[in-house]
Amino acid sequence: MPIVSKYSNERVEKIIQDLLDVLVKEEVTPDLALMCLGNAVTNIIAQVPESKRVAVVDNFTKALKQSV
């Protein structure tokens, strides 16, 4: 069963491209890009209610592993 997102592909792709454009503009190495994105993810997770954080992290890491 395909996953249905509440966000349009166009919106998601635009945001991803904007993020990648910043990384290219700053000429970051892959390790610096991952460090910056990892810190951003940590900041975003901190905004999730504490009672839901473990589930969010589990889902995020599962999706990340499946995408590699």
UniProtKB/Swiss-Prot annotation:
InterPro entries: UPF0352 (IPR009857), YejL_sf (IPR023202)
Domain of life of the native organism: Bacteria
Cross-referenced Gene3D superfamilies: YejL-like
Pfam (any one): DUF1414
Family: Belongs to the UPF0352 family.
Protein name: UPF0352 protein CPS_2611
Organism this protein belongs to: Colwellia psychrerythraea (strain 34H / ATCC BAA-681) (Vibrio psychroerythus)
